[in-house]
Curated annotation (Swiss-Prot):
Disulfide partners: none
Keywords noted in UniProt: Cytoplasm, DNA damage, DNA recombination, DNA repair, DNA-binding, Endonuclease, Hydrolase, Magnesium, Metal-binding, Nuclease
Chemical reaction(s) catalysed: Endonucleolytic cleavage at a junction such as a reciprocal single-stranded crossover between two homologous DNA duplexes (Holliday junction)
Species whose genome carries this gene: Parasynechococcus marenigrum (strain WH8102)
PANTHER family in the record: CROSSOVER JUNCTION ENDODEOXYRIBONUCLEASE RUVC
Protein name per its UniProtKB record: Crossover junction endodeoxyribonuclease RuvC
Subcellular location: Cytoplasm
Binding-site residues for Mg(2+) 2, renumbered to this chain: E67
Amino acid sequence: MRILGIDPGLARVGYGVIDTSGGHQRMLDCGIIRTDPGRSDGERMVEIASDLRQLIRAWRPELAAVEKFFFYRSSNTINVVQARGVVMMTLARFKVPVVEFPPMQIKLALAGFGHAEKDEVLEAVMRELDLTEPPRPDDAADALAVALTGWFQR
């Protein structure tokens, strides 16, 4: 199964593509969709949708796993929610099934406990995908963690 993991944001959307065929998981691609901070929010959302469409066409994921956030007092909340909406809409247009996971569930799936530190989750990602170097940037590593959670929780 090919899974696209997504860590949404307006400035950067982390993505990671894994393949789980053959009895083990392997990373096919990871990176970020970076938007231009000098552009309007609407233009940045168009950038996210356009780049995500290209990823979907290139990798043909059978499942998308998206990190789900719960913000209460963050000034960044609206931007993340808007970017997440663009991600969800684009996935729906391509009929890619979506599963969503909050950060604690991702940490639990990979590190064994929901309050794991970022470096513990990163170590688990590297181990599960048999990587010798940590995926960079951090948003891409986070997206790979989301993709792996999608596989483990299917």
